[in-house]
A protein has these predicted regions:
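N-terminal anchoring/stem segment of glycosyltransferases
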Residues: 1-38, 50-53, 192-196
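Short, well-ordered coil/turn elements that cap or connect secondary structure elements
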Residues: 7, 23-25, 73-75, 149, ...
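Short, hydrophobic beta-strand segments that form beta-sheet elements in well-ordered domains
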Residues: 8-17, 55-60, 78-80, 151-156, ...
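Short, solvent-exposed loop/turn segments at secondary-structure junctions
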Residues: 18-21, 33-36, 63-65, 84-87, ...
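A short secondary-structure junction signal
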Residues: 68-70, 90-94, 122-127
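A short, conserved beta-to-alpha structural element at the edge of catalytic cores
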Residues: 79-103, 108, 115-117
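Catalytic core and acceptor-binding pocket of nucleotide-sugar-dependent glycosyltransferases
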Residues: 106-196
Length: 196
């Protein structure tokens, strides 16, 4: 939480390798060095013993909370962002990443709800061959989708949107000239921003 107000009953945790500068009310979950590259460390949230017991609302640091999170948190099982701005029927089935062909996807892990023990199987699958998966996929979203772990739960369109791509399918190939803003949404993703 960089700025803003929140109810005192909410506990915040920060999963990072560096606790310097964290607000004293934020609990630190140290990132364990397992020789994972960048975003792949996020998958460790599904590793047994990393998170305290209970239900979790995970937020990347590059999101803006702009409304109430009640509806977001009320998801009862593993839930990720559905990228409504990505026309899944038109996405390439032969996307080449670093010489390997993978399927594109329409999910995003910038916001997730899950129970601490709900996704151990995802971690265990990844840990069977982490080096190969980190080469095969550009990030964990592709891994989760292409390895068959995409959730069946998503928030409805308009609750979470992309500042760069907006909310509508046609925005994927023609992003708005100006950064997109949807006042009624709960969360804005700052994905695809580059220097914005």
């Amino acid at each position: 939480l960089q700025w803003g107000e929140h109810e005192n009953s909410i506990q915040f945790y920060c999963y990072t390798d560096d606790s310097i500068g964290l607000h004293p009310h934020i609990h630190w979950i140290p990132l364990i060095d397992m020789d994972l590259h960048g975003v792949w460390n996020k998958l460790m949230l599904f590793k047994p013993g990393i998170l305290p017991e209970g239900k979790w609302l995970y937020l990347d640091l590059d999101v803006v909370i702009q409304g109430r999170l009640d509806e977001i948190y009320m998801a009862h099982e593993f839930t990720m962002v559905k990228c409504y701005w990505k026309p899944i029927e038109q996405l390439r089935s032969d996307w080449v990443f670093e010489g390997r062909t993978i399927r594109d996807h329409d999910i995003n892990s910038s916001v997730m709800v899950f129970w601490n023990d709900e996704n151990y199987h995802i971690w265990e699958h990844f840990w069977e061959n982490p080096d190969d998966y980190m080469i095969t996929y550009p990030g964990i979203d592709g891994f989760i989708y292409c390895e068959g772990f995409a959730p069946s739960n998503y928030w409805k369109q308009g609750r979470i949107y992309s500042r760069y791509y907006g909310i509508k399918e046609e925005s994927w190939y023609n992003p708005p000239d100006e950064p997109y803003f949807l006042e009624s949404a709960a969360i804005c993703l700052l994905n695809g921003q580059g220097g914005l």
